[in-house]
Amino acid sequence: MAKKVQAYVKLQVAAGMANPSPPVGPALGQQGVNIMEFCKAFNAKTESIEKGLPIPVVITVYSDRSFTFVTKTPPAAVLLKKAAGIKSGSGKPNKDKVGKVTSAQVREIAETKAADMTGADVEAMSRSIAGTARSMGLVVED
């Protein structure tokens, strides 16, 4: 018989750096999950990813307090900031431009995020990523 789902917990955790401190501890502690077990499993699964990159994770908690989790790709904004070599986006993206990304970089990010995005094709996903870049104050060059 299938296990009964008790809750879904969505978090963003730095790759390879999950520990019982907030936000992981309180979110999983409320559901009665073994926090250290999750931290070890998450860190093992994300060891191939650049350390410190925020990784969205969806944890499915079952009624017997067991869990499974699915990791997603890093947010587009984080990948764009990394590609442009900037710390943060612009506070006034329509006036102040803070950096530049090439259309090749945008396409590469779209291909990286293809598994998580619901776009019809890479071109549509590239346009979506380019829109995110513009809203952060980045200039997309051809």
UniProtKB/Swiss-Prot annotation:
SUPFAM superfamilies linked to this entry: Ribosomal L11/L12e N-terminal domain (SSF54747), Ribosomal protein L11, C-terminal domain (SSF46906)
Alphabetical list of Pfam families matching this protein: Ribosomal_L11, Ribosomal_L11_N
Gene Ontology CC entries for this record: cytosolic large ribosomal subunit
Keywords, ordered alphabetically: Methylation, Ribonucleoprotein, Ribosomal protein, RNA-binding, rRNA-binding
Keyword Cell inner membrane: no
PTM (free text): One or more lysine residues are methylated.
Source taxon at top rank: Bacteria
HAMAP family, sorted: Ribosomal_uL11
Record note on quaternary structure: Part of the ribosomal stalk of the 50S ribosomal subunit. Interacts with L10 and the large rRNA to form the base of the stalk. L10 forms an elongated spine to which L12 dimers bind in a sequential fashion forming a multimeric L10(L12)X complex.
Protein name per UniProt: Large ribosomal subunit protein uL11
Organism from which the protein derives: Sodalis glossinidius (strain morsitans)
